Amino acid sequence: MESNDRSLNIVFKHSGKKTDVSLNSLKGAVVEFLDLYGTIPLAGKKFCSITGEGDGEQRFSNLLKKTGYSSDPKGFFEDLLSILVNGKMKKITVNGIQIPHLMLMSILEQVLPGHGYISIKDTHQLEKTTHIKVSEKDRKQLQQVIETYPVRLSRHTIRQMLVSKDVAYQYLPFVEELDSGGHTNTWIGQFHDGLLEQMYQNRVIFLLNMACPVYCRFCFRKHKDSRNETNPCVEDVKKAVQHVKDSPGVKEIVVTGGDPFLNRANMAATIDGLMQVDHVQTVRLATRSIAYYPDLFLENESAYLKYLKQKSFELQQHGKRMEVATHFIHPDEVSPESLDIICDLVNNGIAVYIQTPFLKDCNDKGPELVRLFSLLRGAGAELHYIYIPCSPIHGNSIYWSTLSEGIRIANHLRAHLSDRIIPRICTATPIGKMDWYSSGWAVEKVKDNENFIWIRTPYTPDYFKTFAPLANELTNIRVNDEGTIDIQYMAKIGDESFLHGPRPEREVTEKKSASSDDIEMLKSELLKERQTGPSIVDAGDNSGFEKLLRLHETRVEIDARAKDAQIDYIRSDDKITDVIISSSTDAIDSLFYIKPLIKKLQDIPHVNAVRLFSSKFNVEPKAYTRAVINTLGDLNKLCVVNPLRLEIETWFTLADEITNTHEKLVRRLNNKGITVYCNTALLGGVNDSDAHIHSLAYSMRKAGIEFHHLYAAGLSIQQKWNRDHPVDSYDVVDIATKVRREGSGREIPRYIISTLLGEVDYGLTSSFVFDNGQVRIKLGCYDLSYYKKLDKNFEFPAGIITDDDGSPLVQVPGLIKINNFPVS
């Protein structure tokens, strides 16, 4: 400690731990935070307005003045630390100013330094380690919990828990875990041999390691028996790899545990073994350590990250890809370290996708999910699933929400999130996942058992015969009249209007097939005519190259030659996160104009993504020369602070359009951290069958293209073609059913209806309303106030009526509905 430095004496109230912290180290941590991370996305708009402009020193000086501690950093820290040591697990304010969570983390790293993780054996150790009070009335029961469901914490999460009840809620044991409600496990009989499990025809699970550095209280493997299982060895891995070699239908392997990254030998044997299996396309590595134990990847000069990047390159040389799956649940879990890990992986061609359990009283209101997903997106992550409800395992009941609450969250996300980061709302049933209102729904309550409901799934008895015949012998399933399986699922429905009964038999309708000439004409029109919907509100001057379309609260589209007026419009509204750039030629032919445009957008902190529309990606992929790819890579800015992510949007109609050339191009772009996503228009008689879309989804997945939107109706081309060649809503559900059942979960698009008032999810954030013989689409995620916040003079266009709850009802030509069943 420097001679002119002073130290602060700290005593944690509940652990009794005493420590001295250098005042200079605290000040240095805050100055560094303000210098590097004190931005609006990371620290908040209000806090940044308080700290003002300048370097970290100046901004800290401004903060001291605003909190009443001008030129008195010691007083400031004494005040802040006096709150922190009480272990209240809450946000901290100093004289009315809330200190950002990430700044508190910077301070705590000085107060409670260290890495690694700790296994907790008793309540006294829990109190000493976390500095959080254990109630005497709960101590005996908590000890029983610890002995039943092991507790393990990282020092990283301990720091987070001290100032976030939402992080503590996930990892601290609680007496309600003794509630016997729920299952012992959710595994019920699909193929299981050693470390290998199989739930789907085309993918298997490798359980490489049974322990984790931190134990989530809601985990479906939380039981002590699961935590203490003997870890497999390299010979077990080789046996599992041989099973994959002997199973040509297996295309993807999910490597999980526990945390598989804790067993380096098994990880190496898995990757090296699967690399030699010709029919394997994707190796997916699952870990939560990015969120709760980032040191695993960053220690030893980021040795594990370097290893993964090398192995990813080797997999690419064998025509395969590596992906990393992780969980984030609340924005308080997001750290600069976790964002840095995601950026590093994605910038090196390794996709990172996020799965989020829906936890009651933690992330079940909407705004916290909007912030969480926005932070992760800028780093390059893809948002994959929200699981509703939390796994129905023993001791998890405090986390359970009703199904209707989970389904309704989709309305908030569709209204307030970029379309590129809206996860699929799904439920993991004991026989496989289903997506709400496309591949499944709640049918009815189970008679004489109020804790279970029947869920319609996309699976059939024949599906399991080749790999898991026991699945058809289960007593909690039934085959419905359409031939798919309904399964009893442990959950409360909540709002009983979400129980929809069985799907009615399909009425026979004539379907007109398109000629080959028609198909070529439609494909050509899709490439020539931009399918963007209209501006949902007045966005000012829309003349010539200065045209700007406000497509959503978060999204605008501009031309490559947009002027300063359009940039000013974007800058003036901090709800805008995404800018789509299109051109009368093609985005890659307009890079001269796009480069300075992106540089201007980089100075707008709330914009974190730019999307370039490129039809040439489809028809002329060789136009993406090395120079073009390098230029695009230079424009892509995946980073922790003020990111600006670059993505390519393209359109395909049929699977035979996708070639090996596209696959190679996607790989080159991915290795620059650039995602390619595709939209598809469902066209009557062209591709409106489950076989067509399943084939298209598979081809996209194989090429590495993300299948983003499958438009059921509403695009300009659909309004023209589908009037005479209508798409049947029944086909939409048949398509979703087959894609979910036969494909990878990573192949599934969002099923979308485009309207003049914005986009909605088929069935999930929209519904069919019958009005005097006409069918209208109810936009459940929007109302008049939504549009008035974007344009105070907005009024609904002529012909738009509203439902009793204020939701607009619109007509969408070309989509027919021949029954009154809510889903299809």
Give a label for each model feature:
Residues 228, 252-254:
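Internal, well-ordered domain-core segments that constitute the primary functional module
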Residues 233-235:
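Chitinase-like catalytic core of GlcNAc-active glycosidases
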Residues 1-199, 496-548:
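Flexible, acidic/Gly-rich N-terminal and inter-domain linker regions that tether
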Residues 219-231:
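Iron-sulfur (Fe-S) cluster-binding segments and ferredoxin-like electron-carrier domains
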Residues 153, 192-221, 528-564, 568, ...:
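N-terminal pre-triad scaffold of radical SAM enzymes
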Residues 405-536, 728-824:
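C-terminal accessory extensions appended to soluble enzyme cores
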